[in-house]
Curated annotation (Swiss-Prot):
Subcellular location: Cellular thylakoid membrane
Family from the record: Belongs to the ATPase B chain family.
Name used for this protein in its record: ATP synthase subunit b'
Membrane disposition: Single-pass membrane protein
Single Gene Ontology MF annotation: proton-transporting ATP synthase activity, rotational mechanism
NCBIfam families cross-referenced by the UniProt entry: PRK07353.1
Annotated Pfam families: ATP-synt_B
Quaternary structure, from the entry: F-type ATPases have 2 components, F(1) - the catalytic core - and F(0) - the membrane proton channel. F(1) has five subunits: alpha(3), beta(3), gamma(1), delta(1), epsilon(1). F(0) has four main subunits: a(1), b(1), b'(1) and c(10-14). The alpha and beta chains form an alternating ring which encloses part of the gamma chain. F(1) is attached to F(0) by a central stalk formed by the gamma and epsilon chains, while a peripheral stalk is formed by the delta, b and b' chains.
Record's GO cellular component terms: plasma membrane-derived thylakoid membrane; proton-transporting ATP synthase complex
Its job: F(1)F(0) ATP synthase produces ATP from ADP in the presence of a proton or sodium gradient. F-type ATPases consist of two structural domains, F(1) containing the extramembraneous catalytic core and F(0) containing the membrane proton channel, linked together by a central stalk and a peripheral stalk. During catalysis, ATP synthesis in the catalytic domain of F(1) is coupled via a rotary mechanism of the central stalk subunits to proton translocation.
Keywords assigned: ATP synthesis, CF(0), Hydrogen ion transport, Ion transport, Membrane, Thylakoid, Transmembrane, Transmembrane helix, Transport
Name of the gene this protein is made from: atpF2
Transmembrane residue ranges: 28-45
C-alpha cells in the first residue's frame, strides 16, 4: 500500500511541473553544466586534443621522412643500376678486346708455325736434293769404276788405260 501512495505522490508532482520547472534550478543547472564543460575542457579535452595533435604531427613527420627515405633509396637504386650497367658494358668491352687479342695471337702463332713448317720443308727438300746430288755423284763414280772394271775384264787392262 505504501507503494501506491508513493506512486500517486510522484504522479502529482509530475503533473504540476511538466518537463521541468522554470524556477531557480534552471539557471543553477546551466551554471553547473558550464562549470562541468570548463572543467572537462581543462582536464580532458585540451590534453586529449594536444595528444591527438602531437600524434598527427608525429605520423605526418614519419610519413615525410619515409617518403624522403624512399626517394633516396630509389635514387640510390637507380644510380646502382646505372653503375652496374656501365660495369657490364665495360666488362663486355674488356672481354671483346681479350678475345680479339687472343685471336690475333693465335693467328700470329699459326702463321709462325706455318712459316716454320714451310722453312723446315724447304730445308728438308734442300737436304734431300743435296743428298740426291751426292748419291748421284757417288753413283756416277761407282758406275764409272764398275764400267772400267768391266771393260778391264772384257778388254783387258792395257786397252782401257790407253783410252
Amino acid at each position: 500500500m505504501t507503494h501506491w501512495i508513493t506512486l500517486l505522490a510522484v504522479e502529482e508532482v509530475a503533473k504540476e511541473g511538466g518537463l521541468f520547472d522554470l524556477d531557480a534550478t534552471l539557471p543553477l543547472m546551466a551554471i553547473q553544466f558550464l562549470l562541468l564543460a570548463l572543467v572537462l575542457n581543462a582536464t580532458l579535452y585540451k590534453p586529449l586534443g594536444k595528444a591527438i595533435d602531437g600524434r598527427n604531427e608525429y605520423v605526418r613527420n614519419n610519413q615525410l621522412e619515409a617518403q624522403e627515405r624512399l626517394s633516396k633509396a630509389e635514387k640510390l637504386a637507380e644510380a646502382y643500376e646505372q653503375e652496374l650497367a656501365g660495369a657490364r658494358r665495360q666488362a663486355q668491352t674488356i672481354i671483346a678486346d681479350a678475345q680479339a687479342e687472343a685471336q690475333k695471337i693465335a693467328a700470329e702463332k699459326v702463321a709462325a708455325a706455318q712459316k716454320e713448317a714451310q722453312a723446315q720443308r724447304e730445308q728438308a727438300a734442300g737436304e734431300i736434293e743435296q743428298q740426291k746430288q751426292q748419291a748421284l755423284a757417288s753413283l756416277e763414280q761407282q758406275v764409272d769404276a764398275l764400267s772400267r772394271q768391266i771393260l778391264e775384264k772384257l778388254l783387258g787392262a792395257d786397252l782401257v788405260k790407253q783410252r
